[in-house]
C-alpha cells in the first residue's frame, strides 16, 4: 500500500475492459491488472460483471452490419468481463498503446510486449477494449458505471487524486487518497 505523490497535470479518464477470454484465466487477468498498475494508471472504479446480449448489442451498435458484429456480441456475452475506469494524464492513448493493435497477428509482430501481443488469441478474443476518444470514454464509462458522475469526479475526486499522495487498496482494487483509509472512492 505504498503512497505515491501525483503530478499536478490534469488526469484523463478512459474505460478499459478485460474480455471473457482473459477473465477466464486468472493468471492472465492478474498479469493485465499488474500492467495497469505498473504503468501508473490510477484505478478509479472497477467491477466484474456478466454482460447481457442486449447490452452488448447496444454498446457495439456502431459495428452493426459488419461481418464481425454478431461474433463480437456473442463473445462479449459469453462470460464475465472486468471493467475499469482508469485515470492518467494521457489515459486514452497510454491504454491504447499498452493494449496494442486490435488485430492480434499485427500486435504479435509490431507490439509483441503489448497486452494483445502477449495474450490475444484472435481479433475478437483479443483480451482488451479501450476507449478511442474523450467522447467515447464518457459514453462507455456511463454504460458500465451508470452511477458514476464524471463531472462530480472531476470536481471532487480528480484534484485530490492528481495532487495528493495516493495509495492502492488490493482489497478494493482501486486507488484512494492517502489518509482516507481506502473506504470507497476518494
UniProtKB/Swiss-Prot annotation:
State which Enzyme Commission number(s) the record gives.
Answer: 2.7.4.6
Q: Where does ATP bind?
A: 19, 68, 96, 102, 116, 126
**Tissue-specific expression:** Expressed at a moderately low level in many tissues. Most abundant in kidney, prostate, ovary, intestine, and spleen.
Give GO BP annotations, semicolon-separated.
apoptotic process; CTP biosynthetic process; GTP biosynthetic process; negative regulation of cell growth; negative regulation of mitotic nuclear division; UTP biosynthetic process
* Active-site residues, record numbering mapped to chain: 129
Record's InterPro entries? NDK-like_dom, NDK-like_dom_sf, NDPk6, Nucleoside_diP_kinase, Nucleoside_diP_kinase_AS
Q: Name one GO cellular component term.
A: mitochondrion
Which enzyme class, named as a word? transferase
* PROSITE patterns, sorted: NDPK, NDPK_LIKE
**Which family, according to the similarity comment?**
Belongs to the NDK family.
- The name under which this protein is listed is Nucleoside diphosphate kinase 6
Taxonomic source organism: Homo sapiens
Primary gene name: NME6
Amino acid at each position: 500500500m505504498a503512497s505515491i505523490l501525483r503530478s499536478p497535470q490534469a488526469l484523463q479518464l478512459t474505460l478499459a475492459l478485460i474480455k471473457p477470454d482473459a477473465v477466464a484465466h486468472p493468471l492472465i487477468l492478474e498479469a493485465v491488472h499488474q500492467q495497469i498498475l505498473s504503468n501508473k494508471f490510477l484505478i478509479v472504479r472497477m467491477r466484474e460483471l456478466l454482460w447481457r446480449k442486449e447490452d452488448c448489442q447496444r454498446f457495439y451498435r456502431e459495428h452493426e452490419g459488419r461481418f464481425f458484429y454478431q461474433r463480437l456480441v456473442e463473445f462479449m456475452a459469453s462470460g464475465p468481463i472486468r471493467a475499469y475506469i482508469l485515470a492518467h494524464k494521457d489515459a486514452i492513448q497510454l491504454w491504447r498503446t499498452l493494449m496494442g493493435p486490435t488485430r492480434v497477428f499485427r500486435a504479435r509482430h509490431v507490439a509483441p510486449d503489448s497486452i494483445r501481443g502477449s495474450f490475444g488469441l484472435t481479433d475478437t478474443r483479443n483480451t482488451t477494449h479501450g476507449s478511442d476518444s474523450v467522447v467515447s470514454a464518457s459514453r462507455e464509462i456511463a454504460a458500465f458505471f451508470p452511477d458514476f458522475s464524471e463531472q462530480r469526479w472531476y470536481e471532487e475526486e480528480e484534484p485530490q487524486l492528481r495532487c495528493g499522495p495516493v495509495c492502492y487498496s488490493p482489497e478494493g482494487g482501486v486507488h484512494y487518497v492517502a489518509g482516507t483509509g481506502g473506504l470507497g472512492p476518494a
